[in-house]
Amino acid sequence: MNAFNKLYQLVGLTLILGLLHACGSKPNPEKEKAYQKAASILTADESFYPIIDEELYYFTNQTLDSITPVYINEQDAVKKLMKKETWLAFTTRDFTEYERQTLISQKYLPRAIPVAYDGLAIIVNNSNPDSCITIKDFARILKGEITQWNEIYPQNKLGVIDVVFDNPLSSTVRWCVDSILGGKQFKAPNIGAVKTSAAVIDYVEKHPNSLGIIGSNWLNDKRDTTNVTFKKNISVMGVSKLDSATRYNSWKPYQYYLYNGNYPLRRTIYALLNDTRNGVPSSFAHFVQLPKGQKIILRAGLLPRTANMNVRDVIVNKE
């Protein structure tokens, strides 16, 4: 028997032994149970409740798959993903390099999938006479350099600016800290939180001197399919990039102004995915990226990540 035949026999024997070992290996029921439990839920920042619920409604009706949303603050949503308590989290940030490398070192393949853009909306009580603000003044409010309405608008008599967020650990707070304050935390005593986005709207509606910050997907009037009408019980401020805000240089978080970059408080919504089996979490993240999922985002008043935008000029006849 020549050397080549011996080599072929050795390779064949190795393959057979490998197959026998694979066939004889037993599945790990605890590992399977842990995967299925984590695959049964997704986590999302509470501010995404309206859009995620709508996406899930169409996804479950189309696929008959089931996945339960857990709406919490962004920080805890990511923590659950890192602890393998879920394989999917919706946030307004990518994985940090530490998070990514930690998962890779554990033989995972984490992916951050941009799915949409939304605007961070600044809302005030309907009795507030002022309707626009500069980015510079907004930052000064968050830094505590401005605490009274008349420091921005001399004729405004509403007194202290009562700033209200949804949750101290929410995506809204984190985005403002990172993008507006350069990583510095809020210190002003007139800045607080009321747990949820719905509670922010309710608070602003009842307090004339308040200023609320929420995701724009909470604002759209569901009766208006054109997404150009905001809720009537509060006012949405226009935001200007210039040093002086006027109605002509300030923009509200409408889809077109998110699209063309006029609205400055735009943020990306990510699906953070760590599903190793392409199970239901992967299917749902993929669904949100598909034309149908993107159309749902468009209809909800947000800016889709991948869908084509048709922009039409409207001529108003004043006769």
Question: How would you name each of these model-derived features?
Answer:
Residues 75-106, 222-224:
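Pocket-flanking alpha-helical
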Residues 104-108, 253-254:
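Short acidic (Asp/Glu) patches
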Residues 98, 107-110, 129-132:
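Peptidyl-prolyl cis-trans isomerase
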Residues 23-82, 113-116, 124-319:
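Exported/periplasmic ABC-transporter solute-binding proteins
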Residues 1-21:
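Sec-dependent bacterial lipoprotein signal peptides
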Residues 86, 108, 230-232:
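Short, hinge-like loop/turn segments at secondary-structure boundaries
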Residues 95, 110-115, 120:
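Short, glycine-/small- and polar/acidic-enriched structural segments
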